Curated annotation (Swiss-Prot):
<dbReference type="InterPro" id="IPR005358">
    <property type="entry name" value="Puta_zinc/iron-chelating_dom"/>
</dbReference>
<comment type="similarity">
    <text>Belongs to the UPF0260 family.</text>
</comment>
<dbReference type="InterPro" id="IPR008228">
    <property type="entry name" value="UCP006173"/>
</dbReference>
<dbReference type="Pfam" id="PF03692">
    <property type="entry name" value="CxxCxxCC"/>
</dbReference>
<protein>
    <recommendedName>
        <fullName>UPF0260 protein YcgN</fullName>
    </recommendedName>
</protein>
Length: 153
């Protein structure tokens, strides 16, 4: 009976992030693309500012990396979120499954692991599909800061 209950319970509810396989870890990503938007850091305060400027490898329509398996070859500054460095990424969106599970919170109802597709996530406008712009179209990066400080107004 206990084995049946274990197998009926989704892995993200019965395992810690450290206990997950690499495939389980990867499947937690909802594919919103928020990690793939460029961030700017204030050199004086180390504060991070979010932009709507997409990485060159991000397909804005699908919110997927064009070269995910080889992304570090194309974008050396691409982030690699791991179990070990997760605490360093305080800027992760409040909707991020990695963040939520690390904080002991459930996955949102629109998460692809619960719905079986990314449609609900896109419908909730969680993905960057509706706000992202191509890096090649950007002239002044400050015009694309989403959480503008007073000095950038």
């Amino acid at each position: 009976m206990a084995d049946t209950l274990m197998s009926d319970t989704p892995f993200w509810q019965r395992k810690t992030l450290d206990e997950m396989t690499d495939a389980e870890w990867e499947s937690l990503c909802d594919g919103c693309g928020q990690c793939c938007l460029h961030k700017l850091m204030d050199e004086d305060t180390d504060e991070i500012y979010f932009t709507n400027v997409a990485c060159r490898q991000l397909n804005i329509k699908t919110c997927q990396c064009r070269h995910y398996e080889r992304r570090f070859e194309f974008e050396p500054d691409c982030i690699k979120l791991t179990r070990e460095n997760l605490p360093d990424f305080e800027w992760l969106p409040m909707t991020c499954a990695y963040r939520l599970l690390a904080e002991g919170k459930p996955l949102p109802t629109w998460h692809p692991l619960l719905t079986g597709s990314k449609a609900a996530m896109h419908g909730e406008r969680i993905s960057v599909r509706h706000i992202a712009v191509k890096e090649s179209e950007v002239r002044d990066w400050q015009d694309h800061i989403l959480n503008k400080p007073s000095w950038a107004e």
